[in-house]
């Protein structure tokens, strides 16, 4: 095997090799530090005389006729030779980047080109590409294509072009660990052999891709951090074309411990300009990495557009319901505080409030909630009951002052409570602002109605609890209509109502509130007036909302033709 004398080979490599006329066997030890070895390579023939006996690990006798059976010494065989079980072919593996080659010549070329490089940086400003030869660097710098000089936009390597990207070591884990330990000690013994650590290199893929972003997009690395010795997968030209048969290709470029990884395959690809059709931006991979992470989290669901939409609408609805629940609890606490202030005007009222906040006994119970749900559904389903419902609503608002906590338990599964919240906010606003708020609310309702219809189309047989939070112990009544149909009914009825009706209604209700509040404020102390205002606003808007809803029942039942295609 003739020597390839290269001006870029390191002095340590060239030390023992003069221009010999005969061929001889090298036991080349790239990553095995030996304290007494003058050079990492020596010949068994002893012609160079610079190596120690232990370095000549392959004693093959006549070096001129035989190829060496292995490089390196037996304990840590760093140029690892292994036999592919599928094809029976012998291959050698680079100990640093774990790529495999068909023979040692290819490995030696790879090693001197990739791991012994002298760096030539591109002269275009903003480009961090580094090359092992000036010729490659000059040709790269002369190319005006901006895609070559921007570090984030990479080219796709065809997985069938005969280059292996062997990602992980083929030896046993123990050997790999020992090799890693030796590689960690290397820079002390041979300064030129290993590249400096990644964070100092602007061109290193770790820096270029901002951590693991590219690999997340490929789905190949989880959130753990990158192995320092997990190998560079720069795709070399000198890996032989038989590699197609032997290995599964892992086509990725973002994981590398040699700083040459990115530059090397850039350089390779400049050489074959006819493959320019294959260019693509792996920036899109990096940018879609968050989406890919979400997909992995919900990987049990097939990637279907309608299912995605349904999942999103479920999450949105769960969040809405949780917010409604919190709102209900706050309103309730304030009303109960009002009741206590009516009953007892002693100074220990603050202790009472604290105790009540700590253990809200009747603040929120599922049974009352469900009873309310069933009653609400039964009145909503028949239009015949609507007059009775309206009268009962007015009577309950009359008895509001008698029993505040009971009436304040408005069920949080009732889909209207966010609109109730909006109307309550509207009552507290001055009247000119009302129009803008109203428009916003109607637009919001419209979009929610569309989302509900889409979700219904996606899950035509979904159980009525499809949109409830996952852990909620709610068992709805068997015959209750599904949640989305209630939603769409309610939204449509709210859209049918005109602005004028609401304006008049608010006027009447505000006068009514003011009378009630005046009556109640005479009972309470002066320092509790603010609490009182708030509580009665809430109470008033709850009853107003029930009243509103029952008033709209005949309107809801009328458009039966539009109702037909939506109903499950």
From Swiss-Prot:
Compositional bias per record (Basic residues), positions renumbered to this chain: 19-29, 520-550
Q: Where is the composition biased (Acidic residues)?
A: 235-246
Sorted alphabetically, which SMART domains does this protein's record hold? ZnF_C2H2
Query: Which parts of this chain are annotated as the region Disordered?
Result: 16-77, 134-157, 220-364, 391-419, 501-568
Q: What is the effect of changing residue 127 to S?
A: In Disco-1656
**Origin, by domain of life?**
Eukaryota
Q: Where is the composition biased (Low complexity)?
A: 30-45, 282-292, 391-402
InterPro entries this protein is in? Disconnected-like, Znf_C2H2_type
- Output compositional bias ranges, type Gly residues: 46-62
What's a GO cellular component annotated to this UniProt protein? Answer: nucleus
**Which molecular-function annotations from GO does this UniProt entry contain?**
DNA binding; RNA polymerase II transcription regulatory region sequence-specific DNA binding; zinc ion binding
Which Gene Ontology biological process is one annotated for this entry? positive regulation of transcription by RNA polymerase II
Described function: Required for the establishment of stable connections between the larval optic nerves, the Bolwig's nerves, and their target cells in the brain during embryonic development.
Supply the name of the protein.
Protein disconnected
Name of the gene: disco
């Amino acid at each position: 095997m003739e020597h390839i004398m290269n001006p870029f080979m390191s002095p340590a490599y060239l030390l023992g090799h003069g221009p010999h006329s005969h061929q001889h066997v090298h036991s080349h030890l790239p990553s095995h530090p030996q304290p007494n070895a003058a050079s990492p390579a020596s010949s068994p023939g002893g012609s160079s005389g610079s190596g120690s006996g232990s370095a000549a690990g392959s004693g093959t006798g006549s070096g001129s006729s035989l190829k060496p059976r292995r490089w390196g010494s037996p304990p840590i065989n760093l140029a690892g030779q292994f036999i592919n079980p599928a094809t029976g072919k012998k291959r050698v593996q680079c100990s640093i980047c774990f790529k495999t080659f068909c023979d040692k010549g290819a490995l030696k070329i790879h090693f001197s080109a990739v791991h012994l490089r002298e760096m030539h940086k591109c002269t275009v400003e903003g480009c961090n590409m580094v090359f092992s030869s000036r010729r490659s660097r000059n040709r790269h710098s002369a190319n005006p294509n901006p895609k070559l000089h921007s570090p984030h936009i990479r080219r796709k390597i065809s997985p069938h072009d005969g280059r292996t990207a062997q990602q992980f070591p083929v030896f046993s884990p123990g050997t790999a660990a020992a090799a890693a330990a030796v590689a960690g000690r290397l820079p002390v013994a041979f300064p030129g052999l290993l590249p400096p650590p990644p964070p100092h290199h602007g061109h290193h893929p770790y820096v270029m891709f901002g951590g693991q972003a590219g690999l997340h997009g490929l789905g190949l690395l989880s959130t753990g951090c990158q192995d320092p010795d997990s190998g560079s997968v720069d795709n070399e030209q000198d890996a032989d074309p038989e590699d197609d048969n032997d290995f599964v290709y892992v086509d990725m470029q973002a994981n590398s411990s040699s700083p040459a990884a990115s530059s090397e395959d850039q350089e390779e690809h400049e050489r074959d300009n006819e493959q320019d059709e294959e260019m693509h931006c792996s920036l899109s991979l990096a940018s879609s990495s968050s989406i890919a992470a979400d997909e992995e989290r919900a990987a049990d669901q097939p990637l279907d557009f309608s299912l995605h939409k349904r999942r999103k609408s479920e999450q949105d609805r769960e969040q809405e319901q949780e917010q409604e629940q919190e709102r209900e609890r706050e309103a309730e606490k304030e009303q109960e505080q009002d009741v206590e202030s009516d009953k007892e005007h002693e100074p220990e009222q603050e202790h009472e409030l604290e105790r009540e906040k700590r253990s809200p006994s009747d603040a929120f119970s599922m049974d009352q909630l469900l009873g309310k749900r069933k009653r609400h559904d039964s009145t909503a389903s028949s239009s015949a009951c609507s007059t009775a419902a309206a009268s009962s609503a007015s009577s309950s608002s009359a008895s509001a002052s008698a029993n505040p906590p009971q009436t304040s338990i408005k069920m949080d599964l009732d889909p209207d409570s966010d609109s109730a919240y909006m109307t309550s906010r509207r009552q507290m606003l001055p009247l000119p602002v009302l129009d803008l708020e109203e428009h916003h609310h109607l637009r919001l309702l419209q979009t929610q109605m569309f989302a509900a219809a889409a979700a219904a189309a996606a899950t035509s047989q979904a159980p009525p609890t499809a949109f409830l939070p996952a852990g909620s112990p709610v068992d709805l009544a068997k015959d209750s209509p599904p949640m989305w149909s209630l939603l769409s009914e309610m939204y449509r009825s709210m859209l049918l109502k005109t602005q004028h009706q609401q304006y008049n209604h608010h006027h009447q209700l505000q006068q009514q509130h003011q009378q009630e509040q005046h009556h109640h404020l005479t009972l309470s102390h002066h320092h509790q007036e603010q609490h009182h205002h708030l509580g009665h606003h809430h109470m008033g808007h709850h009853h107003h909302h029930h009243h509103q809803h029952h008033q709209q029942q005949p309107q809801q039942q009328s458009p039966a033709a539009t109702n037909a295609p939506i109903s499950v």
